[in-house]
Amino acid sequence: MSGRSVPHAHPATAEYEFANPSRLGEQRFGEGLLPEEILTPTLYHGYYVRPRAAPAGEGSRAGASELRLSEGKFQAFLDVSHFTPDEVTVRTVDNLLEVSARHPQRLDRHGFVSREFCRTYVLPADVDPWRVRAALSHDGILNLEAPRGGRHLDTEVNEVYISLLPAPPDPEEEEEAAIVEP
């Protein structure tokens, strides 16, 4: 009995299979369950219960995100099919690439829904944020791409001078000086 162990990995360990995913899926928030999701047995991964099979048909990739890093370029793919092109915003702030989208409440097959999300990617040190390009495919997949420079971009360090302020006068010394002066 002592030689047996239950296979289990804590999410904070390197052995945990979802510790550093390159793909994020199952982000269909607020869309309801399909019949095959209810009746399908689940897999238990310690802390996360998920359907055994991904639902088939349209919408199975809704919200999916994939990140690819190669020697030549940085690439991220993000499913934004629930949004129109004018509802999606892409911007860079320093070495961060931010994708956000928002649409007001509207009617869908389950009732009324409003959606909003913001995903931020950290760009590798050798990617120039000014060279990021975005393209949206006909099926709602946003392709974010930037060439990797092969060299780390210099970071600007601004060293701020610290000036020393004079100490405030001591109240006792002021009283003594006032007594001596008359």
Curated annotation (Swiss-Prot):
Predominant location category: cytoplasm
Entry comment describing in which tissues the protein is expressed: Expressed preferentially in skeletal muscle and heart but not in the lens.
Domain of life of the organism encoding this protein: Eukaryota
A Gene Ontology molecular function term of the record: unfolded protein binding
Localization of this protein: Cytoplasm; Nucleus
Function in brief: May regulate the kinase DMPK.
Assigned keywords, A-Z: Cytoplasm, Nucleus, Stress response
Gene: HSPB2
Taxonomic lineage from the root: Eukaryota, Metazoa, Chordata, Craniata, Vertebrata
Protein name: Heat shock protein beta-2
InterPro entries associated with the record: A-crystallin/Hsp20_dom, Alpha-crystallin/sHSP_animal, Alpha-crystallin_N, HSP20-like_chaperone
